[in-house]
Amino acid sequence: MKKLFVLEGPDCSGKSTLARALQKKTNGVIFHASGNKLLWPVMHEYHQSIIDNAFAVLEHHDVIIDRLWLSELVYHRVLRPHLERRYQWELLDAQIRGKQGLYIACYPDPGIYARYEKNIDPSHPYDMETFKRICTGYLIELMTMHPRNDRFEYSVNFYNNSVDLAVKQILTLW
C-alpha cells in the first residue's frame, strides 16, 4: 500500500525541506498547496482538487502534500476574517483519514523568524507582525483543536532535529 503524508506548519518551519527529503527516500510525488490571493474565494475547491489528484497518484506512488486544511484554518483567521468561511476542513480530513494519511506537524522553532526575514516567499509577503500571528495561530490550533494530537501522528521541530532523522522516524511509523 502506498503512503500518504500531509505536512502542516507555517512558512519556514521545514515543510518543503521535509517534503523533498521524503520524496527522495520514497520516490513519492509532492503536491504543494499555495495560498495565492486569487484562490481565496475557492480555497475548498482548490484543496479538493489537490486531494483528488493526490489520490489518483496514490494508486502508484507515495504522496506528500505540503500543507492543506490546517493551514487554511490559520491563514483564514489571520488574513481574511472578513471573508465568509466556506471551507469544510472536516470533509477534507475525513478523505485523508480514509486513505490512512499520516499528518505531520512542523512546529515553529526559535529560528523561524530569522529564516522568514531571510527567505520571504513572494507569494506570502507578510510583515513580521502578521507572520508572528500566523505562527501563534498554528500553535493555538495544534494545542487546542488537537490537544491529544489525535490527528497529527508525528510532530517535528527542526531546531533540534535533522531532516534525515525526522524522515527515518516518520518512515518507521509505517
Predicted regions and their residues:
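Hydrophobic anchor at the beta1->P-loop junction of P-loop NTPases
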Residues: 7
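Conserved substrate/cofactor phosphate-moiety recognition/catalytic segment
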Residues: 10-13, 17-62, 74
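Class I (Rossmann-like) S-adenosyl-L-methionine-dependent methyltransferase catalytic domain
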Residues: 4, 68, 116-122, 126
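Conserved phosphate-donor/acceptor-positioning beta-strand/loop module used by diverse small-molecule
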Residues: 65-67, 85-117
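Residue-level preference for the first positions of well-ordered beta-strands
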Residues: 2-4, 62-64
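A mobile, often basic/glycine-rich helix-loop segment
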Residues: 73-91
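NTP-dependent small-molecule kinase module
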Residues: 120-174
